[in-house]
Amino acid sequence: MMTNQRIRIRLKAYDHKLLDQSTSEIVMTAKKTGARVAGPIPLPTKIHRYTVLRSPHVDKKSREQFEIRVHKRLIDILEPTQQTVDSLMKLDLSAGVDVEIKL
């Protein structure tokens, strides 16, 4: 591949432990094939909060709150080789991690 090209990988997950495990797998795979790696860079965590009434029709003051957190990481692979791309394509990551790749 060209030397000035880079691969940007964005990872999203609800579980931060699963996300960190996946990022370490990607970084180790890229380093084994001779590419330079920048990251993982933690991006801001999105927190979605939902407030619902506890009772079906009375007690407006009684409410329950739920939240879900979306953790994100960014990895830049600088100067990737063809072997790097092949090994990243074969990499099997967890089902709870969303991977977005940009060239």
Swiss-Prot record:
Pfam families named in the record: Ribosomal_S10
InterPro entries assigned: Ribosomal_uS10, Ribosomal_uS10_CS, Ribosomal_uS10_dom, Ribosomal_uS10_dom_sf
Any single GO BP term: translation
Molecular function terms, GO-annotated: structural constituent of ribosome; tRNA binding
Domain of life of the native organism: Bacteria
Single GO cellular component term: ribosome
Keyword annotations: Ribonucleoprotein, Ribosomal protein
Entries under SUPFAM superfamilies matching the protein: Ribosomal protein S10
Family: Belongs to the universal ribosomal protein uS10 family.
Quaternary state and interactors: Part of the 30S ribosomal subunit.
Function description: Involved in the binding of tRNA to the ribosomes.
Protein name stated in the entry: Small ribosomal subunit protein uS10
Organism: Syntrophobacter fumaroxidans (strain DSM 10017 / MPOB)
